[in-house]
Amino acid sequence: MTKVYFIAGETSGDFIGGRIIQNLKSNKGVEFTGIGGKCMEEAGNFKSLFPITCINLMGFVEILPHIFNLKKLIDKTVQDIINSQADLLITIDSPGFTYRVAKQLRKLLPKLKMIHIVAPSVWAYKDGRAVKYAKIYDCLFALLPFEPPYFTKVGLDCRYIGHPIMEQEFYSDKIALREEFKIDKNERVLCVTLGSRQGEIRKHLPVFISSIEEIFKSCNNLKVIFTLANPAHEAIIKPFLEDVQFHYLFSSARLKAYAVADAALAKSGTNTLEIVASGTPMVVAYQVNLISFFIIRLLIKIKYVTLINIIAGSEIIPEFIQFNCRASLISNTLQELLFNSKKAYKQVIESQKILQTLGLKSNRSPSYIAAEIIKQEFLESKIKLLKENST
C-alpha cells in the first residue's frame, strides 16, 4: 500500500486537498491520511488526526497564546507521519504549521518525498523563504503563473498548476438567486464575508457591523447576508447582532451569496478572487494586532493586500487596512458601490480583466494537473512495484 500524508490547515487548503484526493483515489493501492477538513474527509477514506481549526491561526502576536499547543500539535503530527510510514508528504498552505513539520521531517526522514502546494508569497515579502523551502521540499506547486521563477532560480522544482477558483461553480442568474434567498424587488443586498479563522471573525465583526448600521441609516431596504466558512461560525456572529436594526441572514452557500449581492464587504483573502469571479463589486477591510501590523510593515514590500490590486499596481478594489479600517470610511465607499452603478460596473470590469491575466482559464483543472504530477513523478514507481509483488 502506497501511503500519502496530507496536511491542510484551513478551508481553502482543505478544498485543494479534497479535489486532489478525488483525482488520485481511482489508483488502487493508494491510502490517504493526515490532517484536513470536510472536503478531504468527503473525498475519500480520510480521517483527520485532529480538527483543522486547531491550526487555523494567523498573525504574530495573535498566535502567542496558542504557541505551546501548536508545538505539541507539530510534534504529534511529525510522530504520526513517522508511525504511518508515509511514502509522500503533501502540505497545503498554512506555512506557520506545515513548514515546521516538514523541517523536522527532513532531518528525521531525509528520504521522504515532500511536496508543498501554494507557494509562499516571496514576491510580497522581504524574506528568504524561497531558499528555505528549497532546502526542505522536493517540489512546489504554485497557483499563480508568475511565481515559479522565484523558486527555480534557487534550485527548487516549482510547477504552475493554476488557481483552485477555476474549479468553483460560479452563478450568474441573479433573478433566480434572489428568489432562492427570498429577497424582495426593492431590497439592496450586501454580502459580508469574514473568513474562516475565529479570531479574525471576532476582530472584524464590530467595525463591519458599525459600517452596515451607517449604511442602514440611509438605506432601510438593506438586506445583509453573512457567509459562513463553517456553520458553527453562526454562533460566534449572532451575539454581535442582538441589537442591530438591519435585516440579515446566514448562508454557507458563499458563491451564491456573492453572486446575488449588489456589493460585498470582505476580509482580505482568497474570497476576494471568488467575489471578483462572481461579478460583484466589493470593499476590502482588514486589521490585526498593532504589534503584528508593525512587524508586517517591516517585512512587506508591496503597497496593497488584495491580489487584484497587487497585480494591477493600483487600487481597483478599495482597501481599508488597519488604521483606515473604520466604519465611516468603509460605509461611505460601500454606499457608492450600492447606489452608483457606474462605479460598481467599472470596478467589476477592471477586476475581471486582471483575473484573466492570471491564467485562470484552462482545459485542465489545477487538481487534475497536481494529481497527474503526483501520480507520475512520485507514486507510479511504488504502485508498479506493489503490483509486481502481488502477482
UniProtKB/Swiss-Prot annotation:
Signal peptide: none annotated. The keyword Cytoplasm does not apply. Pathway: Bacterial outer membrane biogenesis; LPS lipid A biosynthesis. It catalyses: a lipid X + a UDP-2-N,3-O-bis[(3R)-3-hydroxyacyl]-alpha-D-glucosamine = a lipid A disaccharide + UDP + H(+). GO terms for molecular function: lipid-A-disaccharide synthase activity; phospholipid binding. GO terms for biological process: lipid A biosynthetic process. Its EC number is 2.4.1.182. GO terms for cellular component: membrane. Keywords: Glycosyltransferase, Lipid A biosynthesis, Lipid biosynthesis, Lipid metabolism, Transferase. Condensation of UDP-2,3-diacylglucosamine and 2,3-diacylglucosamine-1-phosphate to form lipid A disaccharide, a precursor of lipid A, a phosphorylated glycolipid that anchors the lipopolysaccharide to the outer membrane of the cell. Belongs to the LpxB family. This is Lipid-A-disaccharide synthase. The lineage of its organism: Bacteria, Pseudomonadati, Pseudomonadota, Alphaproteobacteria, Rickettsiales.
